[in-house]
From Swiss-Prot:
It comes from Rothia mucilaginosa (strain DY-18) (Stomatococcus mucilaginosus). Its main location: membrane. CDD domains: RecA-like_FtsH (cd19501). One of its GO terms (biological process) is proteolysis. Binds 1 zinc ion per subunit. The chain crosses the membrane at residues 45-65, 149-169. SUPFAM superfamilies: FtsH protease domain-like, P-loop containing nucleoside triphosphate hydrolases. The active site is at residue 464. The lineage of its organism: Bacteria, Bacillati, Actinomycetota, Actinomycetes, Micrococcales. This is ATP-dependent zinc metalloprotease FtsH. HAMAP family: FtsH. Its EC number is 3.4.24.-.
Length: 756
């Protein structure tokens, strides 16, 4: 039976439910005020703010409770002389006189009341005393100065309070705005299996590193699989490699796959301005990690804290070294029973302390390099997922056109392609967008606002054409895939020379070819305009660096020999990266300079000779560049189909007196298999009759290079003579000097020559 509305329930439960519902309603003012007060109390600024408010209250109270108002000294003396004062009190030391008047003192419309005070200077003390004696006062008192407890407290606590607030503020800044005592705590972020972001399936192109880290995951998931064989879980894994190759991404994948708590921290988060903070944070990090059954600690950019000790000005008292010492102890110290695996990433493994790299700390050191062609294709497919890609886009070809690109570069290419498509209001990402994105990543955005006059465009066209033509005429250079005279980044134009496959080493002949086509732009300017420009400065720098490395690093100079000249990088302050120390004599340095000069001159002469022999093709290429501004691989191949190629380079020996041999290398099993397949497919041939060997041919001297005959104009004769008129006659140029070892920085993944 129900209870009528408005009547109390017999057992009294109904009002109780109403009160409980009211108390649990989050929208009630009472609940909101409680939450606000709780938030206010837990705020890091609550206690210093409260102290400031209390001190201000004391100051205001002391200010507003002043018993009397001040009047001028002459007014006070006049009141005494006029017998208007009832009682007086002199405060010795303050030179202050407090007066109690018989009636209110008024000055104009201002009523001062019956309590006033005035101050006097020492010379007028006698005058004040005489006025007191003649005033007929009811009471008169001399009182020494007594500082009030409140005033003493304020004067004592105010400096302490200000210093405390300043200290609180500084500690809050150091500790990221948290409480004062937390600045020595670890700054690591903890991730659990409930918050996975990246999986191993999201990582591509680094299969070896992925396999090693998957094994770490198996160590944590199934330790019995390894411990039954006596294997121990590795203490640490060091990931090293160039920037952008995916070291941090691999760590994120481990965090998503591990199934154990994952702590992430940067190496720079350990060291602060206060001594001992770094070591304290290391202890706190490992203490927290060891409290879990198993955990992974990831230290990004560990070179910030793990640099070699004993280097620099700090010595043993360096705060960074104390932090490193604590890290060494935590990873493999006296307490060897640890369930923590440390994963670290760096792109400077050469500067790390040897004690950090030894087995027992970082047992595994995994190199993460730029991906190969297959890896680049996999990375492109990962980053293409979720993007509308046109059916005409072949990611395998895109991977082929991007040698040397890291995972970050490829991700940037796909993102730039998407941005360019959105800028043009497109719906799908096509080849044009991807091609432009590759150019933007390699050379920067196109400078459409940089307008060159016709002469500069012509100089740029011949300059880039010189690079491309020399590269096409050499036997050991990669194919030319693109030429453009559109300004991009800091360059006025550029030529792409891309290998068909990934290369991991460079031969001497390839280095010579690199130097020759690097000098092709300068040679073309000299031949055509007889007035070279500053656009070849970058080319000369690259060729010089290549020549220097050939002589001093690669042992490719017959004069210097197979000697490594120049010491390792010195370590003055930063644990590496200093200037290279010269550990050879001045006489050897002079020989090195002479060899570098000879290599550069030979490369320049070779480029000059190639352009003279192919001047008609150079003019045709320059005209096409002026007309279209950008030429792609198929168009370039059509122009270069009649290029007069240079002969194969001679065999080179580091010492001329060594015995020469022409025995070829053995054939690889794959080559033998291909020959066997061809022999099975080819029809049986009739037996051949052996022929006696021919007599050795007589060496005939080669005539000097003759100028090319005049050719028909490419366009009408009224056009610019450097492009449209027939090829001009040029005097004979001597053949390149005796073959010398030359250098070029080994560009294993393609080359790009810029004019800018």
């Amino acid at each position: 039976m129900g209870v009528p509305a408005g009547m109390p329930h017999p057992n009294g439960l109904q009002p109780q439910r109403k009160d409980k519902a009211l108390a649990q309603n989050p929208n009630t003012p009472q609940k909101g005020s409680e939450a606000f007060l709780k938030k206010l109390i837990h705020s890091s600024w609550f206690f210093p703010g409260a102290a400031i408010v209390v001190m201000l209250g004391f100051l205001m109270a002391s200010f507003f409770t002043q018993p009397s108002r001040q009047v001028d000294t002459n007014v006070g003396l006049q009141l005494l002389n006029d017998h208007q004062v009832k009682s007086a009190k002199i405060y010795d030391g303050d030179q202050r006189v407090e007066l109690q008047l018989k009636d209110d003192y008024k000055k104009g419309n201002d009523n001062y009341g019956k309590s006033v005070r005035f101050y006097y200077v020492q010379p007028r003390g006698d005058e004040v005393a005489k006025a007191m004696e003649s005033a007929e006062l009811e009471s008169y008192t001399d009182q020494p100065v007594e500082h009030s407890f409140l005033g003493s407290l304020v004067s004592l606590l105010l400096p302490i309070l200000l210093f405390g607030v300043l200290f609180w503020f500084l500690m809050g800044r150091v500790g990221g705005g948290s409480s004062v005592m937390s600045f020595s705590k670890s700054r690591a972020k903890k991730f659990t299996k409930d918050k996975p972001e990246v999986r191993f399936s999201d990582v591509a192109g680094v299969d070896e590193a992925l396999a090693e880290l998957e094994e770490v995951r198996e160590f944590l998931a199934e330790p019995e699989k390894f411990t039954r064989l006596g294997a121990k879980i590795p203490k640490g894994v060091l990931l090293y490699g160039p920037p952008g190759t995916g070291k941090t991404l691999l760590a994120k994948a481990v965090a998503g796959e591990a199934g154990v708590p994952f702590y992430s921290i940067s190496g720079s988060d350990f060291v602060e301005m206060f001594v001992g903070v770094g070591a304290s944070r290391v202890r706190d990090l490992f203490k927290e990690a060891k409290s879990d059954p198993a955990a992974i600690v990831f230290v990004d950019e560990i070179d910030a804290v793990g640099r070699r000790r004993g280097v620099g000005m700090g010595g043993g008292n360096d705060e960074r070294e104390q932090t490193l010492n604590q890290l060494l102890v935590e990873m493999d110290g006296f307490d060897g029973n640890s369930n923590v695996i440390v994963i670290a990433a760096t792109n400077r493994p050469d500067v790390l302390d040897p004690a950090l790299l030894r087995p027992g700390r970082f047992d595994r050191q995994i190199g993460v390099d730029a991906p190969d062609m297959q890896g680049r294709e996999h990375i492109l497919r990962v980053h293409a997922a979720g993007k509308p890609i046109a059916n005409t886009v072949d990611l395998a070809q895109v991977a082929k056109r991007t040698p040397g690109f890291t995972g970050a570069d490829l991700a940037n290419v796909m993102n730039e392609a998407a941005l360019l498509t959105a800028r043009d209001n497109g719906n799908v990402i096509d080849d044009r967008a991807i091609d432009e994105a590759i150019d933007r990543v390699m050379a920067g955005p196109q400078r459409s606002s940089r307008i060159m006059n016709e002469h500069e465009r012509k100089v740029t066209a011949y300059h880039e054409g010189g690079h491309a033509l020399v590269a096409a005429a050499l036997r050991n250079s990669a194919p030319v895939t693109k030429i453009t005279i559109l300004p991009r980044g800091r360059a006025l134009g550029y030529t792409m020379v891309m290998p068909q496959d990934d290369k991991y080493s460079t031969t001497r002949h390839e280095l010579l070819d690199q130097m020759a086509y690097a000098m092709g732009g300068r040679a073309a300017e000299e031949i055509v305009f007889h007035d070279p420009s500053t656009g070849a400065s970058n080319d000369i720098q690259k060729a010089t660096d290549t020549a220097r490395k050939m002589v001093t690093d690669y042992g490719m100079s017959a004069v210097i020999g197979s000697v490594k000249l120049g010491g390792e990088d010195t370590e003055p302050f930063l644990g590496g990266g200093g200037a290279s120390a010269r550990n050879y004599s001045d006489a050897t340095a002079a020989k090195v300079d002479a060899e570098i000069r000879a290599l550069l001159e030979q490369a320049h002469d070779e480029a000059f000779q190639i352009l003279l022999e192919n001047r008609d093709i150079l003019d045709r290429l320059a005209f096409a560049l002026l007309e279209k501004e950008t030429l792609l691989e198929n168009e370039i191949a059509e122009i270069f189909k009649d290029v007069r190629k240079r002969p194969e380079r001679e065999h080179w020996y580091s010492k001329p007196t060594r015995e020469r041999t022409d025995i070829p290398p053995v054939k690889a099993p794959s080559e033998l298999a291909k020959e066997a397949e061809k022999s099975e497919e080819a029809p049986a041939e009739a037996p051949t009759v052996p022929v006696a060997p021919a007599a050795p041919a007589q060496q005939v001297p080669v005539a000097p290079t003759q100028p090319l005959p005049p050719q028909a104009p490419l366009t009408d004769p009224d056009a610019d003579p450097t492009v449209a008129m027939p090829t001009q006659q040029y005097p004979n140029y001597p053949a390149p000097p005796e073959h010398r070892p030359e250098n070029g920085t080994p560009n294993q993944n393609g080359a790009e020559n810029e004019r800018g």
